[in-house]
Structure formats: C-alpha cells, structure tokens
C-alpha cells in the first residue's frame, strides 16, 4: 500500500493544474475576457484567488493524510524501538527505476521519525498517568460500592424488621385510636355534666363569700376580745406554771428517792464491786496472753492441717518451762509478708513449752489423750500435717506403728537460715532442755532412734524455739483478730482445693517462722495460696518454671506459713517463701535428695543422726502460685524431693541456744559445741548438731569454722593467732570461716577474719560469697564491714543472684540501702531473667521496692537525702502529695523487664495480690500494664480483684464534683459566712464509663451528699444507708438541680454525646463538674436551703405565710438568720411575680433607735404602699422589709398602722400628716407585703399589743430549723474541706466540730436557766468556726475570740440588766449598768466562770496540757467562785429566788477545776481536811475515789465584804449554785470540787411579782437543750483515761438523808444514772421547809 500511495503522488500533484486549465477553456468559450468591465474583472480575480487558496488547503490536507498513511503502512507493523532496521528495509526495498523515491536521505527520515516518536512517547506517558488515576478511582469506587451494598443489605434487613414492627405498632395504634375515640365521647359527656355542676358550685361559692365576709368582720371583733382575755390569762398561767413546777419537782424527788433506795438495796446484796472491777482488765489480759500462746500450739496445727487426728499431750514437767523471747523486728520488712497471710510455719506451731500446751487446751477445749495414729492415717484431707509429728520438746517415743511409716517418708527441710536482728538474747533449745543431765552421746543416740518416727518434725522444727509472745495488747489483739479471720477462710479453701498426697510422696516440712521475729498469731491455719490463685479462672494456666518465689534466703522476718507438703495445684507444689538462719537438717533417705546449692556450714564428721549439719544437702518445700525454678538450679536453697519439677526451695530459721554472757553472740543462730561447753558455755547437743560446727575431734580448720559459725570470738582469736592455720580453708561445699561468720551475722568474728586478711570474695560451690549470704540473711552490719573491705558488690552467683537481689528477697531495708549507697547495679539479671525489682515485688515488700526505685546515690557513693516517697504519696485516689513524689531513678526498661516466661514485676505483684507494690509500680510513668507474657496474658488478666480495681483506675480521670448556689445576695446577715461553691466528691471516670454510668454516678453522689450533711451522725458518703431515699431530710434531691456544667458546657442528667465521657472530659480539658441549684431567680428555694441549711419545706411554709397573710414578722435570738430568711423570701417572691407578668420591687429599711414613725410613713408613701383614698390601687407588687425592729418600740412605730394593715381597703383609711403640715387619708393596697425581723427571743410589755395584728414566725434555738442548722452547716464545711469525704467519727476534726456545736447548745441552755433570754445566741456567730484538719488549737483560739468579743459582753449586760430590774427605773437602772456594785460585779464574774467551765471548756477535745494554755485567752475563767455563796447566809429569810427551769436534766460531765475554799471546821475531825484537785487524781482507782467521797466535806465560805443589792441578785446567786450542782448540765469540777458546797443554802418561796417577767420563757426540752452526757463526751475525747470516765459517771449532787450518806457514796455508780436534778430547795439549818410536801430532815448527798 505504501508503494501504491507513492505512485499516486505525482498524479495528485498534477490534478490542480488540469482543473485550472479546463476552467479557463470553458470560460473562454462562454465569455470573452476582454469584454468584461473593470468591476467584473475584479470579481473574477477574487474568485480565482479563492479557488487557489482552497486548492492549497486541500493539497496540504492531502499531504498530511498521505504522510500518516505512509508511516502507518510502512512502519506500523514494526517495533519503533529499532528505527534503523526499518530504514535498512526501506532502502533495500526501495522504489524501482520508474518510481521516484520519497526521500533520498534516510537520516532525515530517521530524524522525522524520532521527533514523532518523542511526541508520541510524551503523549502516551500522559495518557498512562491519566489511565492509572482513573483506575485507582475506579478501585476506590468499587470498594465503596461494595461497602454500600453491604450496608444496603443490612439496612434492607433492618428495614424489613422495622416494617414488621411498624405494622404491629400501627395495628396497636389503630386499636388504641378506636378505644380513645370511644373514651373521648364519654369524656365529652362527662365534661358537660361537670360544667353544669361547676356553674351550680359557682353560685354556691358566691353566696358563701358573702357569708364569709360577714363572718370575718365578726371574727375580727371576737379576736380583739380574745386577745384581751389572753393577756389576762398570761399572768395567771405563769403563776399556775410555777406552782405546777414545784409540784413536779417534789414528785420527781420522791421518785428519785425510791429509785435510789431500790438501787442501794441491790448494791448491798451484791456487795462492793470495786476491787473485782479493778482486776477485770488483768483477767482480760491474762486471757489474751493465753490465747496468744494457744496460737502456737500443736492442737491448733492439728485442727487446721489435719482436722481428723489427735495429738497426744505430753506430761513431762521439764517441758513446761515458760519461755520469754524479746523481739525486735527488723524495720525493713513487714512482720508478716503479704503473701503469707498470717500462716505460721510448722516450727512455730510444733515446738512449744508445755505451759503453752496447757493454755491451748484451756482455750480450745480438752483434747482426748490418744496415741498418735499411724502414717496410714496421717494422710489428711489437706495433705500431710506438720502438726501430727511428735513435738521435739515432748520427745516421748511414739508408738511403733507410727515410727516405721514415718521413716519411710522422704522429708526434707531447707537449710535453716536465721537472720534475726541483734536482740534475741536467750532462746530456748527444747532438745537440750529435755534431759539436761544425760551424756551428749546418749542424747545423740536417743535423737537418732527417735528421729525415724519424727522425721517431718525434726527436719522442720528440731531446734526451733517457739515465737516470742508479744505482751502488747494492741498489736496482739489486732494481729490475732486479722490473722484468725484470714486463716479461717484459707483453711476452708485448702480443704477443697488441695489434692490428697500419699505418704510415700510426702516431703519435709516447709520452712517455719523465725523464733525471734514471729509475731503472735492466733489459731493460724494452713495456706495453699497457689490453689486460690492458679484456679482464678484466668484463660491460660500460669506457666511452669515461673521464678515466683525465689530460691534465695528470705527476709529476717520469716514467712509465717505452715505449708502442706503434699498440697499441689496443677502439678505445682506450693511452698512458703524462704525463711532465715542457716542451720541444716539431714534427711534420712538421701538417695532421693539432690545436692544442696545454698550457703551452708561445714559438715559434721561422722555422727549419723537424723539432723545433719548445714553443709549437707537438704530438700525443702516452698510455696508459689506462679512456678518454681528447676530442682537442679544452684541457689541458696535446695528443692524438695518430689516428682514435680515445680518445687521452690526455701530456708527455715532454726534458733539455737546461746549463752547471754557472750557479748559477741549478736545472733541467736549460733550454737554450742562440746569444746565450747567445756570452756564455760552452756552445753547443748542440738545446737551443736545444727550449727554446722565440727565434733571435738576435728582438725583446726574445721574448728575455726565452728568458732566462726557460733560467734565464739575468744576461740576464734585464739585460733587466728596460731601459726600455719589456713583461714581460707573451705569445706566440701566451699564454706569458709568468713562465710559462716557472715551467714550467722557475727560481726565481731567477721571483723577478726577480715583483719586477718581472709579472702573477702571467697565463694562456695554455688558461687555465693560472704557478702551474698550476709545480704540473704539481712546482716547489715556484716555487709557494712564487707563493703568496707572492698567486697565485690555486683558478684553474681551460679544462678545470677547478686547481693542486692538476695537482700531484696530478704526484705531488709538497711541491707538494700547499704548496697545501693555502695553503688551496686540494680539492673543485673538472674539466670531466669529476674531483677532485684522482681525479687522485691515477689516478697511483697513495699519499702524495698521504694528504695530500689527512688534511692539516689551521688557519684562518689554517698547517698543523697533519701527521696523515697512516703506511702501517702502513692495513693492513686488521693492524688499527689503537696510536695509531690520524687522522680524514680530506675528506667522504664528495668520496670518493664520480663523474665523467661514473659512476666514483669507488675505481673508478679498483680497475681499475688500485692496491691501496695503494684501501686508503687504504677506510679512509674514508664510502666506498660498491657505487656503480655508468653501465654499472652496482661497484668490485668492475672491480677486479683483488688489489683484489677487498681489497674482499672490507673488511667481514670479524677474530676471534682462541686455544687453551686449561685450568687449570694449581699445582706447584713451571714452572707460572708456562706460560700458559693462546695466540693462534694471526686468522680472517677474510666475509659469504659458510659454516659449512663456517668449520670448515675453524678445523681448518686448528689443524693449521698444531701443525705450525709443532713444526717445525725458522721456517715460516710459511700455508705449504702442513703441509697433508698430520694430526698434528704432538708428536702434536697436531684430534682433540686437546675443544670450541670461540664467545664463550660451545660449538660443534663441522661444526656449523652458521641464521645465517651472519658474522651469528652479529657478533650475539653474539663477540670470540674458543677451542679447548679435552683434559686430565687427560678422561683425556687433550693439554693437558699443549701446555703443556709434550713429545710426546704420550712422555707416554703414561710413563703406561703408571707404570700397569704401579707404581714409577717420573723423573731428569734440575735444571730438566728432572720434578715437572711426575709431577704431570700422577698427575692423568690419578686421573681415569681415577675414570671407571672407583674412588676415587683423590694424595699429594705433598717430600723434603729432614731427611726421615727414619720420616716416609716415616708417610706410607705414614697414606695406606693400607702395610696391616697382617691387613687386607684397599683398593679405593682411591693415587698417592704423592716430590719432590726427590736431597736425601736413596736407599739410606737407600728401602732397607727395596725388597723390599715389588717383591713386593706378604702373603707379603713388612715390619716397621716405630711411634713408641710397638711394631712391626707391613705390606705394599704393588697399588692403590698410587709416583712419584719426582730432579734429578740420574746416580746415584753406594750409590744404585746402588736402581736395579734401580724403573723409571727418564732425562730427558737431549741427547735427546728435553728436547732439543727449549725450541725448541718459545720458538717457540710467539713465535707468540703475534705474534698467530699466525711472523716471517721473519731477524727479530731469531727470531735472539734462536735465540741463547737455543744458549746452553742450548752451556752443557750445555761443562759435560759439563768433567766436571761436576751443573751441567747443564734447560730450565726458559730458559722465561721474554722475547720483546719490537724489544728484543733485554731478552733479553740477562734472560740476564745468569740467568747471575749461576743459571748462575755452579752452575758455581762444581760446579768446586770436582770440584777437591776427591781431598782428605780430610768436613771437608777442606767447608773447601775454603768457603775455596777461590788456584788453585781461578783455575780457577773461568777456567771462568766460557770458558763466558761460548764458550757465552753467542758468537752473540749484538746489534751489537758494544751487546754490549760488556752484557758488564759478566755476572759472570766479564773474567778474564785466561793463568793457565789456569800449572799446566801444574809438572805436566808428574803425569799427572793425563783425556780427558773424545770426541764429534765442529763448527767454531768467531768472537768478539773480551780481551787475552792476552806473545809467545814466542824467536820474536820470526822473527815479529811483537804481535797486535792480532781485532775491530780485522774489516774487513781475507783475505790480510792469512793473512799474520798465518803471522807470529804468542803463547804463554801462567805466573803462578808461583798453584798448583793437586790433579791434578783440573790436569785442569780442561787441559780448559779443550782447550775454548779445540777446534773442537767455538764459537771464542772472546776467549780464544784467541794463535796457539800451547797449544803448551807436556803430556798424560800417564790415571789410572784418579781418572777413574772422571767417566766416568759418556756422550759427547754431535754433532748434539745441539754449537752451530751458525760459518757458520750468521754468516749469522744482521746485525752481521758478509762479511770477518768468511770469517775465522771459517778458524779451526783442529789441531797439524801444523813443516815444514807455512806450507802450513797458506796453506790455512786448506780445512783448516777438518775436523770433528774434535785435543786437545793431544803436548808437543813432552817425549820422552814419549802418546795416539799412533808417535813423531815434532809441532808445533801456529798458532792462527788
């Protein structure tokens, strides 16, 4: 085709010429060009030019098309990548001779082709990129399409379900519509009937209104008449009341006499109980000691481990020696490690002195003395019991039937390691004390033959002395109670979780407790923690070979665990953590025992006993819920002979007898040898066998080791002075003399050996150096010596254990600290991948872990100030301490390091339930709690319940929940004491918390808070006590909340957002959740209730009274919040009226002494309360508040307004004169409200005329709402101070708050009795009581300032006012107030002193010494009160005092007092002449107090220089005396130390004329007015001893007949229960008998 197109090219080029010629010929034929005009020629030319241009365009198009066709057909079939091949082919197949070639130059063709190829390549690449982008879009669209299709299918299915549901709903709705339509028709018919009835009722009401208006007019007239009659009745009523009170008092006296006689008869029958009462604590103490000894007896172990077998009690008298071991536990580790849970090792349980065994039976009941059962019967349900083996101290040979099977066992005990800190001076060696007179070789023979039957016992308990008894009752009781509870549960669990083990596979007894450090344990039980932990239910089982409990020596406090040798869980033998002190026991069947790899003493030559030296291999049993090292692993302990590889070796502490004379015996672990016994030491075979020392016939090097092991400094120094002695000689196990001395903690021996240049780093066959074994045993003084001699502190034993690792396993804080200060490496790992942190966590020792994490060391080795944080800094709930915890020094990699099984330290702590350790680890910022072990388990998966809760709260947001009352309107009353916001709790928001949970938590917290602050006691907010109640007793609940603010965003309960609460609060950085209470702005009073602690229902009632009666006056003692209540009610009314569409205005007017009636008229007129008669009433609501009305006369100020206020209409106008002299008629309209406040307890005189025209609201201090207001207010302040938590009732803050509350109540109670109602105080002054945790002195100082500034001046003014009531009115009374007489001053000072001691200082929780320092700050506290009685003798016949209060009275409290005056000289011969202060006799016995009560009679003397000027003064004196002696008030021994202080006073008849003004008060109920009883006060005070409480309860001032004084004094305790008081109405020096119905002589009971 290319050839054809090429051949056609000339023809195409000639075609235009031929066409043009043909056109010209045709033109010539048609017309002549010459004949054409010029215009025609131009047209012809233009046509021809157009044709030429068209031809050129056609030619160009054809050429381009030809070129494309040519290239496509010539080269389209070939690869364009090789153009030379195409050129060569075209050239060879070129055109023939007749055809003209297209191009003679191939290079030009190549260039053209290349240029074309470049353009095509660019175009193709662009198209390829576009195609790829389109392909990607297409793929994405396909994926989206698939997702949409799936979603469409789901939605379609859901739609079908919804359609089905909707159909069902529609059908139901249709049915309901039909039903409702029928109901609508019925309701319409009923409505018509009701409307008809309503019309009839309206007609009836209109008629009733007319009748009521008429009745109202009649009733107003009748009320006026009734008020007049009431005023007349008042006087008569008070007279009758006084008469009734006298009769009641006399009746009460007679009842008391009967009660006392009955009680005295009962007491006479029972005899004097004083001495038995004193001995009671001792008896109790003895019982406690007995129970402590029971905790370590064989029968206890039997009951726990065996539960079926009976232990034969030995009767050997030699074995009943008492044992006393002083204890000084190491401070580095807890007495009872956390994972032992109070279990006692068999050593502690079995070897006991006989006297303890007796006490055990006395406490637990008799045990039948049967023989020990055979081994076949000793396979108990809980595995082999250590309690069944005969006690070594009771070494009577057992029956043959039990001997042979026991010998067949393969028990083993780990090398006994004792690391008791240096204070056990005398320890019991039961074997040595068994037969002290026998030859040592005979004892050895007995030991051997007896041993076969006692293998488990010997191996575990051979020389174990029993735990010392702690005589401290506090620690004893707490420990016994806690461990008894734990062990009861553990025992029950172990019975069902421990599989049975045959006698053939029984192992040796597990390590027991250290005799020197074992705390007293009560009725301990066996513990198999692995059973409880492994069977937790976590998905995979705990992996084997877990180094959970190491094969290293344990802390100086032994792990108290009586391990069951046969108890296995998932083929894992559980064993206790390693114990202490190196003594060894040899196993009978050693063919099954692997070689020991622990630090041990040299072997004992050729005495084949059941007990071998510490150098011999001994198997041990250990407990671990995680796993164990392989049995062959070298370590400080030897695995038990068991078919299971999961055995954890442990060590048992054996204590040998050491002569206390030796000063070098720093540790009880040393033992005696025959050689040493010859030199004066007490001989003991068992310690010799156990100590690892050689026999007397051994060589010198072995003797050197024995001396070092025993701590015999004298023998050691003698041997070191010999020439040629190898001090570095090692026995077969590699134990050198330095090793033995360091292992036993003999510091002097270590020092001697080091000075003699012994090798400091000589290791045994397992690689343990003396430093290693000293760290393992907790001998920090040896560590200090060894490090000073450059011992290798980073030496690793065969298993990789470093001294620091071993010290952490031991838990000795001092050892760890010394090693850290020496610069040891904390990151060295053992062969199993454990670090020292693993070891510290495995033992549950928090102090060790803190030291590892926080102890910093300077470069030169000296430690910085210890930066280990206190325990309080690690409370996840409490947040950081004020100073902040220090930064840990260990890196995150070390904290998160995992062992071979993938377990980190956090895994170990969580699986064992060591919450404190886990908490410390969680404080490290780099901890990874999600790290998984080889079984794919996280820390949370293996954690106990407590630890799971801790981990769940690890990342919880702690946001305070606060409650706000909004803005508090400023007023004169207590607005400064009210806070706007209060913290009620802290919300823990976890990641999984939902909005529903969040809503419930907020609602529950608010409900609990309202309940807690309004309850009677100090309840915890977490208590379930309030969960059932919806509203508190103050009326607040969740419905009182207006809205809740999450930071700045409003939220309502039940509302949810797309984010979870945790994400939402963290993203918004919410710092607090604020609950806003509904307030007056919303027309509610909830915020007012919360701010003032006045119950909501009472506030709503007050509001109803104001709205209904329009004229209301609030009155009560000063400080009763009258002004605050009035202002808040006015605000609430204002916003309510405004919400209803009425304008409202509040007008406040403060009344003072110069406020006149004209000013009040001006206020009323100016604010449109008084409207001219001609003017129409306004729609505006006006609330007028008149404050401080007590400063003016009510009758003068409001007298002219009474009628217009009562009848508000134009029919009752009132004419008032203006300032310009003109007068006009006004009236009060219905939209005016008048609210007044009076700071006065009661009205007097002419003010009573105003009473009937107003609605009065009395705020009494002894009734709600004022009675409980202060208690609720202070409790809320405490809650806010403690950030939402209520402290315990015994907390000093609670005590000081209760004291402040009791001061207010007792003050008012005493002032009411004194007849001075004007001095009563409302709670306002006490609202500012400071609540400072830990600083009770601040509250006492505040109280002294309040006393000096407010209370004392008011009391002084009130008493002077009463004392001058009968004097001339006017100037005389004023003068008496300004210049009181000497007698009045004495009365005032006496009253202040009595009030201070009875009401203020009584019950103060401060210690006596601190309180004595604070007393000086109170005015009037040091008044000699003997003058109070001075006027009684002068006024015997005056008859001027009245009985003020007859309310029931409570028992007196107890308080020490200043001095009283001389005793009665007439009775000095019969009784003691003086009485010491009660506070000097506080610790005396009760019998001594009772004897004093019989002997002492000190009466008040008279000061004749002081005279009282009126009968009222005498009345005050007698009332003060009555208060001194009254049981209704708190006892003030400060005032009434004398026994017969009131005996000389007379009482005369009441003067009605003078008593009338005083009798306006009503009696105060006992429950509200009286202070707490002495027993309650004593229980709340930490500073009072038991004896003091007993003495305070004996106080009584009741007069009794003379003949029964002795009986009363003997039976004071019973008589003190009488609750009523006998006022001093009888004067035994006068024949006149007042206040009584019969005449007989009465003598006052001695004042006790």
Swiss-Prot record:
SUPFAM superfamilies: Ankyrin repeat. Gene3D superfamilies: Ankyrin repeat-containing domain (1.25.40.20). Residues 1-26, 200-250, 322-439, 451-476, 492-608, 1438-1492, 1522-1648 are annotated as: Disordered. Residues 330-342, 372-392, 492-503, 1477-1492, 1548-1557, 1571-1584 have a biased composition (Polar residues). ANK repeats lie at residues 699-729, 733-762, 766-795, 799-828, 832-861, 901-931. Residues 393-415, 1609-1623 have a biased composition (Low complexity). Changing residue 543 to A: Almost complete loss of CTTN-binding and loss of regulation of spine density. Keywords: ANK repeat, Cell projection, Coiled coil, Cytoplasm, Methylation, Phosphoprotein, Repeat, Synapse. Interacts with CTTN/cortactin SH3 domain. Interacts with STRN, STRN4/zinedin and MOB4/phocein; this interactions mediate the association with the STRIPAK core complex and may regulate dendritic spine distribution of the STRIPAK complex in hippocampal neurons. Activation of glutamate receptors weakens the interaction with STRN and STRN4. The keyword Phosphoprotein applies. It is found in: Cytoplasm, Cell cortex; Cell projection, Dendritic spine. The modification Asymmetric dimethylarginine is found at residue 495. Changing residue 602 to A: Reduced CTTN-binding. One of its GO terms (molecular function) is SH3 domain binding. One of its GO terms (biological process) is regulation of modification of postsynaptic actin cytoskeleton. Changing residue 540 to A: Almost complete loss of CTTN-binding and loss of regulation of spine density. It holds the Pfam family CortBP2. Residues 119-274 form a coiled coil. Residues 200-218, 225-250, 1528-1547, 1630-1648 have a biased composition (Basic and acidic residues). PANTHER family: CORTACTIN-BINDING PROTEIN 2, ROLLING PEBBLES, ISOFORM B. This is Cortactin-binding protein 2. Transmembrane segments: none annotated. Regulates the dendritic spine distribution of CTTN/cortactin in hippocampal neurons, and thus controls dendritic spinogenesis and dendritic spine maintenance. Associates with the striatin-interacting phosphatase and kinase (STRIPAK) core complex to regulate dendritic spine distribution of the STRIPAK complex in hippocampal neurons.
